[in-house]
Curated annotation (Swiss-Prot):
Highest taxon in the source lineage: Bacteria
Family named by the database record: Belongs to the oxygen-dependent FAD-linked oxidoreductase family.
Subcellular location, record wording: Spore coat
Name used for this protein in its record: Uncharacterized FAD-linked oxidoreductase YvdP
GO biological process terms on file: sporulation resulting in formation of a cellular spore
Major localisation: other
GO molecular function, one term: FAD binding
Lineage of source species: Bacteria, Bacillati, Bacillota, Bacilli, Bacillales
Organism: Bacillus subtilis (strain 168)
Length: 447
């Protein structure tokens, strides 16, 4: 036993609050840690890291409870350092800079900024924590206009593997800032504060939601992939196709311009198949954000387990990958399955691949697919169905997104980080040479 004491809001197994503390957004990842430390400041994080090392206890850091695969932000029998109580935001309106503690969820952050007249590309799921999403890149329907979340990261405060509080920006620990802009959460330090560039929001924006009969998914997808990556970069759009039983096939997005202009831009999509609904409206900017991201309880808790996998589409999909998608959605055996797409390009693609750790700058679109279940007896079949799609899709996609990880990926360094993996390993060796911050698919230090 060491001399360091745990500080902050500490909950051991068996204490009041433990049952709530173990709940994550995805029940699939739930485990039973020894202790949770709900840090109130960087010193609590530092003490928890030192305590874990002194007591030889595995450790993880958690922000929004939104890790999508096992043992990433929680660990059985270990310590979970949860930063969700650290959720303050300081906005410098004159310089368009937001200093943000890493425990705040995306929803309250985006909506608070919108009310103050600013926008930022903070993702499309309001319960996700800013702590994790930033490190992996982070994107949403505004990213074609203003870049990835990580592209807007100017500085950070982190706690290293020895419990030292360090800062990184363009003039101090620049290599750590580079790695933190796409290198994945929890690898180099446990972050407690970010400084972001934010952008003046327009007074209004135009949003849309278009719904088609599920049976028209091939027609809709073919039209979407030929249109979405090349349309005006002020337009961000995702396409989501659910299981055949559910029957939903829809596109939703935002345009930083007028309704008249958007209707003109949407013509190729509106003329695909026979939409059953097309809701297009100009709203005050904060209301547009509410349209895209309705409020959800925080911390978020899904009522079903979910398995994800992800990839990038660099070429138009032929009939073969589209038929793989359709069969997956037709054969869904759990509670739900879906394919999600978002268009790429614009500001994202203007950043060189090696300027930050985020490598995937030039695909046409991003895609992820999921299967969900409530009954434990359905788990194996749903895990297998997601993996089968991953294998079948290999000829048609490239890479994978570290924020939507899949532990079936063996060559994860290349898949997540491309040619940037070697430099990330060198930076890991500098800031965490003993590999204290290790977890499934964490970056190993170079030797």
């Amino acid at each position: 036993m060491g001399s360091t004491q745990l500080t902050g809001r500490v909950i051991f197994k068996g204490d009041p609050g433990y049952t709530e503390a173990i709940k994550n957004w995805n029940p699939y990842v739930d485990v039973y840690p020894l202790v949770f430390v709900f840090a109130q400041n960087s010193y609590d994080v530092s003490n928890a890291i030192k305590w874990a090392r002194e007591n030889k206890v595995p450790l993880r850091v958690r922000s929004g409870r939104h890790a999508l695969d096992k043992n990433l932000s929680v660990v059985s029998g270990g310590i979970v350092i949860d930063v969700s109580d650290m959720n303050k935001v300081f906005l410098d309106e004159e310089n368009a800079i937001a200093t943000v503690q890493t425990g705040i969820p995306v929803g309250p952050l985006v909506k608070g900024l919108a009310r103050d007249g600013f926008m930022a590309p903070f993702g499309d799921s309001p319960t996700v924590g800013i702590g994790g999403i930033t490190m992996g890149g982070g994107f949403g329907v505004l990213s074609r206009s203003i870049g990835l979340i990580s592209d807007n990261l100017l500085a950070l405060k982190t706690v290293d593997a020895k419990g030292r509080i360090i800062h990184a920006d363009q003039s101090h620990n620049e290599d750590l800032l580079w790695a933190s802009r796409g290198g994945g959460g929890g690898n180099f330090g446990y972050n407690t504060q970010y400084t972001f560039k934010v952008h003046r929001a327009p007074k209004t924006a135009t949003v849309f939601n278009i719904i088609w009969p599920w049976e028209q998914l091939e027609t809709v997808f073919k039209a979407w992939q030929k249109w979405a990556p090349f349309v005006d970069e002020r337009l961000g759009c995702y396409l989501e196709i659910y299981s055949k039983i559910n029957g939903l096939c829809h596109a939703e997005g935002i345009f930083l311009g007028s309704k008249t202009e958007l209707i003109r831009l949407l013509k190729p999509l509106l003329h695909a198949g026979t939409p059953t609904e097309a809701d297009i409206k100009t709203l005050y900017y904060p209301d547009a954000i509410d349209f895209l991201d309705p409020d959800e309880p925080i911390p978020g808790r899904n009522d079903q387990s979910v398995k994800f996998s992800s990839a990038w589409g660099h070429d138009f999909w032929s009939d073969e990958p589209i038929s793989i998608m359709r069969k997956f959605l037709e054969d869904a055996t759990g509670t739900e399955a879906n394919f999600f797409f978002i268009n790429w390009g614009g500001a994202i693609s203007r950043v060189p691949k090696d300027e930050t750790a985020f490598f995937w700058r030039h695909p046409l679109f991003y895609t992820e697919w999921t299967a969900s279940w409530k009954n434990k007896s359905q788990e194996d079949s749903n895990l297998a169905s997601v993996e089968r799609v991953r294998q079948l899709m290999q000829p048609y996609v490239a890479g994978s997104y570290v924020n939507v990880p899949d532990q079936n990926i063996e060559n994860f360094g290349k898949e997540y980080y491309g040619a940037n993996f070697a430099r990330l390993r060198e930076i890991k060796a500098k800031y965490d040479p003993e590999n204290v911050f290790r977890f499934p698919q964490s970056i190993p230090p170079s030797r």
